[in-house]
Curated annotation (Swiss-Prot):
Native organism taxonomy: Bacteria, Pseudomonadati, Pseudomonadota, Gammaproteobacteria, Moraxellales
NCBIfam families: aroC, PRK05382.1
UniProt cross-references to Pfam families, sorted A to Z: Chorismate_synt
Organism: Acinetobacter baumannii (strain SDF)
Pathway where this protein functions: Metabolic intermediate biosynthesis; chorismate biosynthesis; chorismate from D-erythrose 4-phosphate and phosphoenolpyruvate: step 7/7
A single Gene Ontology CC term: cytosol
Keyword tags: Amino-acid biosynthesis, Aromatic amino acid biosynthesis, FAD, Flavoprotein, FMN, Lyase, NADP
InterPro entries from the UniProt entry: Chorismate_synth (IPR000453), Chorismate_synth_AroC_sf (IPR035904), Chorismate_synthase_CS (IPR020541)
The family this protein is said to belong to: Belongs to the chorismate synthase family.
Reaction catalysed by this enzyme: 5-O-(1-carboxyvinyl)-3-phosphoshikimate = chorismate + phosphate
HAMAP family registered for this protein in UniProt: Chorismate_synth (MF_00300)
Function: This reaction introduces a second double bond into the aromatic ring system.
Cofactor binding mode and count: Reduced FMN (FMNH(2)).
Protein name, as recorded: Chorismate synthase
Length: 363
């Protein structure tokens, strides 16, 4: 299973399963001298962890991260940083009924076909539980990028099911469990999720993630374009089925004279491209949006097959999110931070001595 790492110079490798002993990550490439504590990582982990809201899974995990290497006397040493989160609230018996059957819409069938068998407890390695380590690793990248460049990475939910947030107030985002910046949309989100629970079904969601003050020049054309790597990182998140950069799919109905992001000596006149031109950061705010599918873990019986390839029905038990997008914001922020950190190091490695013909224009 070779797909457990992301990044070239800032490289994150994770391991662990939903109902195993715990989750681990190795974060390689962190520059030495960064002041770093477990509390720095815990802030984002607390935003993602389960059991903190009635609108998400009721599995209660403290998600207390332990730094086991790579930090000495409060600073990074430049050696690999080892991270550990122990699982404490597994209820594997909830999954006994799917040991011989496949949950439709999940990775059960494909994991079994690929590896010959699977860890059926909570989805094993395919569970979104794994993303806790991404958030921890991403917090390191966020801290470094913020301190060195003033980069601010933040996200918010723009849509849950058919309910759409119409405005954005960043001050409202941390005040509700939906990471929503529209105070008027929150009651509608609450009512929808409550209704979904009662109906035994789920819904999808859409999120926007922004990275402000990213310097111009990051990205490695042609195959490792910055937007290509961002899309790769976002698509690696559980349940993500669509990624947009800038105006995204809306560009199909736009015209060239509307979307070309004209430049002046005082700055850009628009940002339809989402802060990336030719696969390289333009210095403008990077705008990313992701769409997450409805979780297939619902209490409505569904048709499936068993290990004998016989038709049967399955009823998913366990504790699940009625909308996985509710807790996806810190995960998406982390993945964007990991990609940006990697591209900063790659840009510095090759282009540290490059002198552009003029000072970059204002975003």
């Amino acid at each position: 299973m070779a797909g457990n790492s992301i990044g070239q110079l800032f490289r994150v490798t994770t391991c662990g399963e939903s109902h195993g002993v715990g989750l681990m990550a190795i974060v390689d490439g962190v520059p030495p001298g960064l002041a770093l504590t477990e509390e720095d990582l815990q802030k984002d982990l607390d935003r993602r962890k389960p059991g903190t809201s009635k609108f998400a899974t009721q599995r209660k995990e403290p998600d207390q991260v332990e730094i086991i290497s790579g930090v000495f006397e409060g600073k990074t040493t430049g050696t690999p940083i080892g991270l550990l989160i122990r699982n404490t609230d597994q209820k594997s018996k909830d999954y006994g009924n799917i040991a011989q059957t496949f949950r439709p819409g999940h990775a059960d069938y494909t994991y079994t076909q690929k590896y010959g068998f699977r860890d059926y407890r909570g989805g094993g390695r395919s569970s979104a539980r794994e993303t806790a380590m991404r958030v921890a690793a991403g917090a390191i990248a966020k801290k470094y990028l913020a301190e060195k460049f003033g980069i601010l990475i933040r996200g918010h939910v723009t849509q849950i099911g058919n309910e759409v947030a119409e405005k954005l107030d960043w001050n409202e985002v941390p005040n509700n469990p939906f990471f929503c910046g529209d105070v008027d949309a929150v009651p509608r989100f609450e009512a929808l999720v409550k209704s979904l629970r009662e109906q035994g079904t789920s819904c999808g969601a859409k999120l926007e993630i922004l990275a402000e003050k990213v310097p111009v020049g990051w990205g490695e054309p042609v195959f490792d374009r910055l937007d290509a790597d961002i899309a790769h990182a976002m698509m690696s998140i559980n349940a993500v089925k669509g990624v947009e950069i800038g105006d995204g799919f809306a560009v199909a109905g736009q015209f060239g004279h509307e979307t070309r992001d004209e430049l002046t000596s005082h700055g850009f006149l628009a940002n339809h491209a989402g802060g990336i031109l030719g696969g390289i950061s333009s210095g403008q705010t990077i705008r990313v949006a992701i769409a997450l599918k409805p979780t297939a873990s619902i209490t409505t019986p569904g048709k499936t097959i068993n290990l004998n390839r016989e038709d049967t029905d399955v009823l998913t038990k366990g504790r699940h999110d009625p909308c996985v997008g509710v807790r996806a914001t810190p995960i998406a922020e982390a993945m964007l931070a990991i990609v940006l950190m990697d591209h900063f190091l790659r840009h510095r490695a090759q282009n540290a001595d490059v002198v552009p013909p003029f000072v970059p224009i204002e975003p």
